[in-house]
């Protein structure tokens, strides 16, 4: 099991520098931004999502929250042991969206689409989109970002989905090219099932030492919730440092794509 950092260790390790500020709402001086960071929160745990939104708002940022369309309807049916915490419903998702946070689909029932036939995979995505169309205010399927459960996809389902949505997130390398027109496939890294503080810090530090690009890190819950949780205190301090860097933008996926 990886070691959970305390505050002093994290501050020492992080060393991310400081100058400037960027917010998801203003997107000011984007010509100066060379590194984009998206923390993409999956599964929609109620307590974690509320706390995540509060931490992001503290720094004028918008969180990227991806929710399972049917989980709130029957919380007794768990995809696996890492989903054993209460999730939010669309009343919460609409509230967070109205506060400027990105709420996007993360499957209908958290099925691995590599393990079902193609037609069934399409049907599950359509069911997911139907729920979002009915429940999430202002949702436009063609402008949405679909986040695959388990970051599991294949060329056949990716080709079909590309015509349905603006972009999709799946497994692969952590670093994507800087956003460009028509960008569809986004890849990400993740870590778990233990606490991710150290891995996340190391991943970001390495990214910031390299050339321009877009880091997408798939996060889940906070503190004790979900697979590979991040400590809320660590997230708070991380965002404080990142927002002080002139060349860094911390953005949800859609605003990042808008930079193309």
Feature names for model-found ranges:
Residues 2, 9-29:
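N-terminal export signals
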Residues 32-102, 124, 129-148, 241, ...:
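Active-site beta->alpha N-cap acidic-glycine motif
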Residues 36-38, 213-219:
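Generic beta-sheet signal
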Residues 37-44, 81-82, 112-115, 188-192, ...:
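The substrate-binding groove and active-site-proximal loops of carbohydrate-active enzymes
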Residues 43-46, 70-73, 109-112, 150-154, ...:
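Solvent-exposed loop/turn segments at secondary-structure junctions
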Residues 48-51, 56, 112-205, 234:
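Catalytic domains of cell-wall/extracellular-matrix polysaccharide-remodeling enzymes
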Residues 58, 167-180, 205, 209, ...:
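C-terminal domain-boundary segment and adjacent tail
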């Amino acid at each position: 099991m990886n070691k959970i950092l305390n505050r002093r260790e994290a501050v020492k390790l992080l060393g991310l520098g400081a100058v400037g500020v960027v917010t998801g709402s203003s997107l000011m001086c984007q010509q100066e931004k060379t590194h984009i960071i998206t923390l993409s929160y999956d599964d929609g745990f109620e307590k974690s999502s509320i706390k995540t939104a509060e931490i992001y708002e503290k720094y004028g940022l918008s969180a990227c929250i991806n929710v399972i369309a049917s989980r709130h309807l029957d919380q007794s049916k768990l995809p696996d042991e890492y989903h054993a915490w209460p999730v939010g419903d669309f009343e919460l998702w609409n509230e967070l969206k109205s506060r400027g946070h990105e709420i996007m689909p993360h499957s209908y029932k958290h099925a691995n689409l590599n393990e079902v036939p193609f037609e069934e995979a399409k049907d599950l995505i359509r069911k997911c989109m139907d729920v979002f169309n009915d429940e999430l205010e202002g949702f436009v399927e063609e402008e949405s970002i679909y986040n695959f459960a388990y970051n599991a996809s294949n060329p056949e389902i990716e080709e079909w989905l590309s015509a349905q949505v603006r972009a999709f997130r799946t497994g692969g390398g952590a670093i994507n090219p800087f956003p460009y027109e028509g960008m569809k496939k986004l890849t990400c890294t993740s870590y778990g099932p233990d606490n991710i503080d150290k891995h996340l810090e190391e991943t970001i530090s390495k990214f910031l030492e390299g050339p321009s690009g877009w880091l997408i890190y798939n996060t889940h819950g906070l503190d004790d919730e979900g697979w590979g949780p991040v400590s809320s205190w660590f997230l708070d301090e991380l965002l404080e440092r990142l927002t002080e860097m002139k060349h860094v933008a911390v953005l949800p996926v859609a605003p990042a794509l808008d930079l193309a």
